[in-house]
Design a protein with these regions (language model features):
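Alpha-helical solenoid scaffolds in eukaryotic macromolecular assemblies
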Residues: 1-587
Length: 587
């Protein structure tokens, strides 16, 4: 929008558009701000038409383009945009908008139906209209609520007086479990009575049914007339399609259990209730159990309109699709849609999973690029930095990973407490991958002066010393090293007393289970008294000091960083709480 010197309209309207534009740029996730901007652009110059100024029309198009790039699943706004283009520039411009909209939300029954209706009114070449209906049918024909689309398709063929094509459509539809399945069957049955036998069923089926009728009459020595034979064949055909109806009825009833619980079948920026997510999970479970690939895919696509901001369903879709043969590109497209449109970078898990997928497919440079793209937005994200370093380790060896850590530790863009966590992973690589305990220990010793306030640093160092293998002869020496880590942590770190006590519990466990000598329990009791005794004997026992003087405490914001716990995104996967109620947060 900044490319335009004027937005069209009066000075007052220009001022309002500038203000609304600023609000959108300040908070691009605000749906309300976007709606206000689009409405203001629509009302420029008293309402836009083909006689409006080029500036006003450009402003309108720019606002819609940006809005629908941000929220591409808003089928109603695609329809409004197409209507506006039709009024402003005619059918070709409107058709371009419909094409963009249907590419953005491929499974919208409403949008495809509107597009087909538009095509019916503006195109008089029958095969072009039918081609569009068939395209639409591949995307929305299986939808449980697809009846408006099929009604529109039948309406078009009625206008063409193409009874054979109406019959063919109905013959398809009666096999689809959907909300209004029964009325399609009734119409199909009535129409089939007026169609030639050769148009009702395939030639091989017709031959089989004729043979059955003749075989049934043969034992009685009866030779039926052609009219009688046709009557009996039609009765068999009617029974055959009644079986189809009953199957469709049964399949519809099964799905109604889940369909009836869907309260919001369209996209919106607000959260859903836990009960809605639970229903989608159960519905997907059902279709996967049924095993029809097309129906499963269609349901996932429906689900990911309603649940677009819930990354659990993107993960699920990608995992399911990856279990199907020869679906690498389809899986890639699922990840691309998730990361480019719906899941914010502040929740990097789906992006990391995408990177792992690309690495597994041999596209290592793409996997590296995904990590780098996340880090441009989240330079302090420990999980992503560690993931990137381990990607380099897998592809380039241990030194490549350590160089990656060193580069991040040296970067001014990385927070002090993030660096502390990275140092611990550097040490762990030396210990567990290279097998060098002394090099790993030196990393802790050489960095303690910088990261003494980091919980993650002390946790890692303490675990490192606790996990060293020992013998009866070396346990005492090992115990001294552990004791020194505990004493250093208590006296040098400005972490909260609660966090220090949490780490000291590890030492109490060690003393009880592996402590050596008569003084092990004395150390246990001394530490227990200082941790849990009354204030008269425990006061200031966990206060950091320098030259005997207490050090100042960390402010609250710094303390939260210093004492942060770090996790991998995949540690949070698990069964959803079936008892959860209320609104389900996106994250």
């Amino acid at each position: 929008m900044s490319d335009f010197q004027t937005y069209g309209g009066s000075d007052e309207e220009n001022l309002e558009i500038r203000k609304l534009n600023s609000e959108v740029e300040a908070d691009p996730d605000s749906f309300e701000a976007w709606e206000k901007l689009v409405r203001a652009c629509e009302s420029l110059e008293g309402g836009l038409n083909r006689n409006s100024s080029p500036q006003a029309l450009a402003t309108l198009r720019d606002s819609y383009d940006r809005f629908l790039l941000k929220f591409p699943l808003l089928f109603g706004y695609w329809k409004k945009y197409a209507d506006l283009e039709f009024n402003i520039s005619g059918p070709e411009s409107a058709e371009m908008v419909y094409e963009r909209g249907c590419a953005s939300i491929t499974n919208s029954v409403d949008l495809w139906t509107d597009y087909c209706s538009f095509k019916m009114e503006t195109t008089h070449v029958a095969h072009l209209v039918r081609d569009l209906f068939e395209r639409a049918a591949t995307y929305v024909g299986l939808d449980f609520l697809a009846h408006p689309f099929w009604d529109k398709y039948i309406e078009y063929e009625e206008r063409q007086e193409a009874q054979d094509k109406i019959y063919a459509i109905l013959k398809r539809v009666i096999n689809i479990p959907m909300h209004q399945y029964a009325r399609y069957y009734e119409r199909f049955r009535a129409l089939s009575h007026t169609q030639p036998l050769t148009d009702i069923v395939e030639p091989e089926v017709l031959s089989r049914l004729r043979a059955e009728v003749e075989a049934e009459a043969a034992p009685f020595g009866v030779v039926k007339s052609e009219l009688e034979t046709e009557r009996d064949v039609r009765a068999k055909i009617d029974a055959m399609f009644y079986d189809v109806f009953q199957t469709t009825q049964s399949e519809t009833t099964k799905r109604w259990t889940y369909e009836s619980e869907i309260k919001r079948p369209y996209f919106h920026v607000t959260e859903l209730d836990h009960s809605q997510l639970a229903n989608w999970r159960k519905y997907l479970d059902f279709e996967e159990e049924e095993g029809n690939l097309a129906r499963i895919t269609a349901l996932y696509e429906r689900c990911l309109v309603t649940c677009a901001f819930y990354d659990e369903f993107w993960f699920r879709y990608a995992r399911w699709m990856s279990s199907q043969p020869n679906k690498e590109e389809e899986v890639r497209n699922i990840y691309l849609r998730a990361v480019t449109l719906f899941v914010p970078v502040s929740r990097p898990g789906i992006r990391l999973q995408f990177a792992y997928f690309e690495e597994a497919c041999g596209r290592v440079e793409t996997a590296q690029a995904i990590h780098e793209a996340i880090l441009t937005k989240l330079p302090d994200c420990v999980e992503v930095i560690i993931s990137a370093a381990n990607l380099r380790r897998r592809q380039g060896g241990l030194d490549a990973a350590i160089d990656s850590y060193k580069a991040q530790i040296a970067s001014p863009a990385v927070d002090l407490y993030t660096k502390a966590a990275l140092v611990t992973h550097w040490a762990v690589l030396l210990w567990k991958v290279k097998g060098s305990v002394e090099e790993a220990r030196n990393v802790y010793l050489n960095n303690v002066e910088w990261y003494a306030d980091s919980r993650e640093f002390w946790r890692s160092w303490l675990d490192f010393e606790l996990e060293q293998p020992t013998t009866t002869e070396s346990e005492a020496e090992n115990g001294e090293r552990i004791s020194k880590v505990i004493n250093e942590m208590r006296t040098r770190s400005r972490m909260s007393t609660a966090t220090k006590k949490e780490l000291c519990v590890k030492y109490l466990n060690y003393l009880q289970q592996r402590g050596v000598g008569k003084d092990a329990m004395k150390k246990f009791l001394d530490l227990d008294r200082e941790m849990n005794g009354p204030a008269s004997v425990s006061k200031d026992r966990f206060t950091a000091k320098e030259n005997g003087q207490p050090l100042g405490e960390l402010d609250e914001a710094t303390r939260l960083k210093a004492e942060a716990h770090y996790f991998n995104f995949f540690e949070f996967f698990g069964e959803a709480d079936p008892k959860a109620t209320g609104v389900a947060e996106f994250h």
